[in-house]
């Protein structure tokens, strides 16, 4: 009888182990954990991030890969929605663009830092005269966005860039800003963005129709440096971080997250610790600088009908107050 009970006990332990592996040994897309770690080139970080509960799929791979983006979309649900936050009806556009890229890798194969400290550097004027450059450069991963320059602002924002999120309308075209160590991540909002990427990589004449301003007519980054962000990240920024409605009233223009909020959401998926810099806006001073570069003022941002800066500031204040992230500015 005693041996029988021991056998039952051992069987229970084994069954628990199997169920544990099934439930926790895969990420939100049902990729085996070892496969995902290999794909990410990141070792396991056993420290649970402070922001982990914000994410539905904590181990989501942030970039699309041609070999499996259809399968991944079916798992995450982005196959049920058209652009800007899904791939429905535009699968061939994505496939065509992804086929022109040389890689969908996240980190360099030699990068084996298990728990990554990341800083997301916004473009806010609050960075002016802060001399945070050396501090920013000390992080494992540095995420920037759009055409926020490093050149000429090294003392304020540092010199290194790991990832730079961009749109066709906001990417650098001046080769003086080129950095061979940067991975440039396209955030897709419309089919024209994918068409633009194909045309620019093939050296074709750029069709500029359908953009809110003239897109870049040349790309300073090499083919191996380009990635396409999974629309799920943008969807998550809009619906889970900012709590935007999926359908806006007919008398309201739909609101979309800024590149900064999208960058923070991406950081939550690849980092164990996230710090922020340059995300504070002075709404009460319309003449205060909008960016740490250039002459634009806050009055310009207040005219933007496509973003909800109040919702974004509430979100940022909340995650800072709850110590999910650390704010450097």
Swiss-Prot record:
Its EC number is 2.4.3.6. GO terms for biological process: cellular response to interleukin-6; glycolipid biosynthetic process; protein glycosylation. Residues 26-329 are lumenal. InterPro entries: Glyco_trans_29, Glycosyltransferase_29, GT29-like_sf, Sialyl_trans. It is found in: Golgi apparatus membrane. Glycans are attached at residues 129, 181, 295, 308. Disulfide bonds: none annotated. Keywords: Glycoprotein, Glycosyltransferase, Golgi apparatus, Membrane, Signal-anchor, Transferase, Transmembrane, Transmembrane helix. It is a single-pass type II membrane protein. One of its GO terms (cellular component) is Golgi membrane. Its main location: Golgi. Residues 1-4 are cytoplasmic. The chain crosses the membrane at residues 5-25. It is an enzyme of class 2 (transferase). The keyword Glycosyltransferase applies. Transfers the sialyl residue from CMP-N-acetyl-beta-neuraminate to the terminal galactose residue on sugar chains of glycoproteins and glycolipids. It's alpha-2,3-sialyltransferase activity is specific toward type II glycan chains (Galbeta1-4GlcNAc) on glycoproteins and glycolipids such as neolactosides nLc4Cer and nLc6Cer, whose sialyl-products serve as precursors for the Lewis X antigen. Critically involved in the synthesis of functional selectin ligands needed for neutrophil recruitment during inflammation and lymphocyte homing to the lymph nodes. This is Type 2 lactosamine alpha-2,3-sialyltransferase. It comes from Mus musculus. The gene is St3gal6.
């Amino acid at each position: 009888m005693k041996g029988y009970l021991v056998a039952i006990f051992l069987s229970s332990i084994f069954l628990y182990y199997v169920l544990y592996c099934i439930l926790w040994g895969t990420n939100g897309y049902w990729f085996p954990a070892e496969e995902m770690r290999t794909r990410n080139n990141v070792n396991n970080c056993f420290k649970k991030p402070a922001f982990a509960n914000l994410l539905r799929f904590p181990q989501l791979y942030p970039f699309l890969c041609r070999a499996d983006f259809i399968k991944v979309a079916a798992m995450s649900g982005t196959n049920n929605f058209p652009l800007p936050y899904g791939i429905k009806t535009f699968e061939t556009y994505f496939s065509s663009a992804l086929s022109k890229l040389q890689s969908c890798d996240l980190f360099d194969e030699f990068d084996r830092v298990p728990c990554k400290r990341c800083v997301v550097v916004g473009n806010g004027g609050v960075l002016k005269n802060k001399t945070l450059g050396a501090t920013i450069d000390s992080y494992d991963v540095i995420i920037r966005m759009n055409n926020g320059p490093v050149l000429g602002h090294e003392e304020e924002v540092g010199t290194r860039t790991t990832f730079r999120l961009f749109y066709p309308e906001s990417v650098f075209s001046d080769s003086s800003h080129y950095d061979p160590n940067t991975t440039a991540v396209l955030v897709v909002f419309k089919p024209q963005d994918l068409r633009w990427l194909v045309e620019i990589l093939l050296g074709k004449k750029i069709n500029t129709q359908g953009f809110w301003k003239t897109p870049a007519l040349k790309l300073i980054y090499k083919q191996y440096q380009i990635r396409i962000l999974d629309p799920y990240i943008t969807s998550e920024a809009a619906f889970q971080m900012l709590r935007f409605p999926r359908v806006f009233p007919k008398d309201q223009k739909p609101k979309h997250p800024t590149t900064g909020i999208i960058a923070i959401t991406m950081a939550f998926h690849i980092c164990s610790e996230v710090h922020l810099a340059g995300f504070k806006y002075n709404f009460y001073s319309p003449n205060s600088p909008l960016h740490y570069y250039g002459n634009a003022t806050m009055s310009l941002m207040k005219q933007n009908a496509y973003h909800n800066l109040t919702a974004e500031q509430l979100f940022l204040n909340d995650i800072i107050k709850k110590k999910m992230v650390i704010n450097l500015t």
